[in-house]
Amino acid sequence: GFPIKCALIAEGGERDAALSHLVDDLNVADVRIKYVPRAQLDALSSHGAHQGIALEVGNFPYADVADILDRAGDGPALVVVLDHVTDDGNFGAIVRSAEVVGAAGVIIANKRAAGVTVGSYKTSAGAVMHLPIAQVPNIARALDDLKAAGFWVGGASEHAEGSCWDAPFEGRVALVMGSEGDGISRLVLEKCDFLTKLPQRGMTESLNVAQATTALCFEWLRRNAGELMGEE
């Protein structure tokens, strides 16, 4: 998780039993502790919802693609690849869905893309702490690494001829989702082994990228449930 740089504790908090135990744990972990006026914590938090403590944390420890491949092992695996998704809320929701279905990890661009922030942490319901997330300088090159590890690369596109019900989602799949406005970029699209889309009957143009990713992740899980979950 996030490395803790410093703990800010409300003055007088050491007399609170729960906080006292927490202070002991922080001391064991060799975390620096500062006692500050409660008003300072009020100013740092939302509506004073701090329970007498706030943590100053360092940068999120992103994983490497190699870490995701190690987690994927040799059997069926899903890696979600985001081609410059920019909204923190969408990113957090995608990570939550990917973690719920047991994906091996999420790969994102290191520039012009949403990453792990306080907002995306909340939207993910903490899932960012349980799933490797790799930042890479080149999405297309990361897909080459996944292909070399036996992954079949599928891109979500409204221009796909067939729906996800017919897509080759069995086994090792890298699911590529494009940005909210532009979709998958040309260079990344060229790396895709197949394109897929969600079937729909209504009048609304489409789902947003987070909703679409969730649906496709669960379709992958359904296809591989027999091997992954012991279902017939």
Set out the residue ranges of the language-model regions.
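N-terminal positively charged helical leader segments and presequences
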Residues: G1-D70, E232
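Short beta->alpha connector loops at strand-helix junctions that form conserved
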Residues: P37, D83, A109-N110, L131, ...
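Hydrophobic, well-structured mid-protein blocks that either form specific transmembrane helices
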Residues: P76-A125
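Amphipathic alpha-helical repeat scaffolds
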Residues: T86-I94, N138, L207-Q211
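Structured adenosyl-cofactor binding patch, chiefly the S-adenosyl-L-methionine
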Residues: V100, K122-A127, R186-E232
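Histidine/lysine/aspartate-rich catalytic loop segments that bind and position anionic ligands
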Residues: A104-G162
